[in-house]
Amino acid sequence: MIQSQTHLNVADNSGARTIMCIRIIGSSNRRYAHIGDIIVAVIKDAVPNMTLEKSEVVRAVIVRTRKELKRDNGIILRYDDNAAVIIDKEGNPKGTRIFGAIPRELRKLNFNKIVSLAPEVL
């Protein structure tokens, strides 16, 4: 469960290393975000000489959470970290590579470009 002020790792090569959630896109008073939700975040740590810089406000989709994800068939997914992929206004990733495993629930939410770039889909 991701809420405001939560720090997340960035799972792509867009230039950001860590981001902090400042808003959850959706309802006006939504408290928590889960896998597949879009958040507004600020970059807290970035790689030097890249397009994204520290303190820049971006949109990101959550791809991994430490809170377990329960599927209809009884399988429970839990990851070691909270991670997100930075996206643009159309929902396409800003980076060209995705690091780490991605859940298949993102395909149902029309993040097909992220799923196709991922090395492993669980």
From Swiss-Prot:
Function as written in the Swiss-Prot or TrEMBL entry: Binds to 23S rRNA.
Protein name as it appears in the record: Large ribosomal subunit protein uL14c
GO annotation, biological process: translation
Annotated InterPro entries: Ribosomal_uL14, Ribosomal_uL14_bac-type, Ribosomal_uL14_CS, Ribosomal_uL14_sf
Matching CDD domains: Ribosomal_uL14
Record note on quaternary structure: Part of the 50S ribosomal subunit.
Pfam families, per the entry: Ribosomal_L14
Gene Ontology, cellular component aspect: cytosolic large ribosomal subunit; plastid
Superkingdom as given in the UniProt entry: Eukaryota
Source organism (scientific name): Cuscuta obtusiflora
HAMAP family: Ribosomal_uL14 (MF_01367)
Keyword Ribosomal protein annotated: yes
Entry keyword set: Plastid, Ribonucleoprotein, Ribosomal protein, RNA-binding, rRNA-binding
Family, per entry: Belongs to the universal ribosomal protein uL14 family.
MF terms in GO: large ribosomal subunit rRNA binding; structural constituent of ribosome
Lineage, uppermost ranks: Eukaryota, Viridiplantae, Streptophyta, Embryophyta, Tracheophyta
Encoding gene (name): rpl14
Cellular localization per UniProt: Plastid
